[in-house]
Amino acid sequence: MWQLVFFALSCDLVLAAAYNNFRKSMDSTGKRQYQVQHGPCSYTFLLPETDNCRSPSSSYVSNAVQRDAPLDYDDSVRRLQVLENIMENNTQWLMKLESYIQDNMKKEMVEIQQNAVQNQTAVMIEIGTNLLNQTAEQTRKLTDVEAQVLNQTTRLELQLLEHSLSTNKLEKQILDQTSEINKLQDKNSFLEKKVLDMEDKHIVQLQSIKEEKDQLQVLVSKQNSIIEELEKQLVTATVNNSVLQKQQHDLMETVHNLLTMISTSNSAKHSLVAKEEQIIFRDCAEAFKSGLTTSGTYTLTFPNSTEETKAYCDMETGGGGWTVIQRREDGSVDFQRTWKEYKMGFGSPSGEHWLGNEFVSQVTNQKRYVLKIHLRDWEGNEAYSLYEHFYLSSEEFNYRIHLKGLTGTAGKISSISQPGNDFSTKDADNDKCICKCSQMLTGGWWFDACGPSNLNGMYYPQRQNTNKFNGIKWYYWKGSGYSLKATTMMIRPADF
């Protein structure tokens, strides 16, 4: 369509150019013919001649003297009329020419436009057909691609869903494993801390053992020097046999004098024993009430029996009347004893001793007793725990301890585990631990799973009493690794 419009405009411009050239030629030259070339066509126009036009030779001089003025005026009017006629003829010819050109050009333009339209229409139809075919082919290809993309998208969505489910499952497993790892790390940290503490304590114990070893080596060296000195003295004594004989004679006289003194002291002892037999009590409270208010060793009888035992009576602490059932003060007595020894008692009542589980069990089951435990550390501090009700079961129940109503300054919590635990020794394991606490911590005691206390443990001297888990300990006063200097356990009737 645009090509047709362009072609029509081109033809109009050509015709206009030809007409302008024709008019210019007529105005400037006055020729009889005019030729127009348009494409393969050539147009020639014949024009009439202007015979009445004045020639240049007939021109007159402008400065001539005008003598016959009227004659010249008529001639000029006539010539003007001729020129006007000529102009009218030329105008008519031009109008005819224009009409002819327009008629011919219209026909040619119509033919050209029809041919152009037909050609363009065929071309456009062919182009449209090709475009439709290409569009159909592209549409088919796009449909195939869309189907492939849809299938691929569906498959990817399924894979994505599967991956999402797998990812969620893995995330849950990772969270569970992370939680387990954190728990294991906490346990590991706790165990590492315990191991480090044990290593530190082990190092301290090794240092203490090393110091004891050095002391023993010094003692052995001293003993070696003493033995050498004794050997020298023995050699000297062997050589000086005569001197020994004289000394033997002197010794015989001394022995005779000693025998005389012993016989005299035996008679005095018999009289003292007879006096003691007259004052026998079931506990120290009865002795106190009878007027004996001096602390010391007294003879006590088992309830409902004539069997006797020696016990130390504290007649000063807290109003007196206390029967001491245990004392630790210098480490002179070994408390790693058998079941039978703890049952009957051992040691000296005036020093370190254990009164005996059987006697304490029988006495505390006759009436209600209180138990007082007095403690002293190596810095001179003292504390106590007082139980308002205390008794021991019989041997049938392993002398199980029973305590109620704790007061005192040695901790707000009882360091003897409750409810009551059975008594254990190195040859009778009655605790609640598979580790045999009596053998690990030494001494007989009411162990739970070893527990927070043991007043019958190993005695450690000053500067060696820390970080000792088998020492004399009372956890809720000094902790589990501090070994005390002195302890006293004593009982008294609750109604005293």
Swiss-Prot record:
Its main location: secreted. The keyword Aminoacyl-tRNA synthetase does not apply. One of its GO terms (cellular component) is collagen-containing extracellular matrix. CDD domains: FReD. Residues 275-495 form the Fibrinogen C-terminal domain. GO terms for molecular function: metal ion binding; receptor tyrosine kinase binding. GO terms for biological process: angiogenesis; blood coagulation; cell differentiation; Tie signaling pathway. Ca(2+) binds at residues 429, 431, 433, 435. Interacts with TEK/TIE2, competing for the same binding site as ANGPT1. Interacts with ITGA5. Interacts with SVEP1/polydom. Interacts with THBD; this interaction significantly inhibits the generation of activated PC and TAFIa/CPB2 by the thrombin/thrombomodulin complex. NCBIfam families: GGGWT_bact. This is Angiopoietin-2. It comes from Sus scrofa. The gene is ANGPT2.
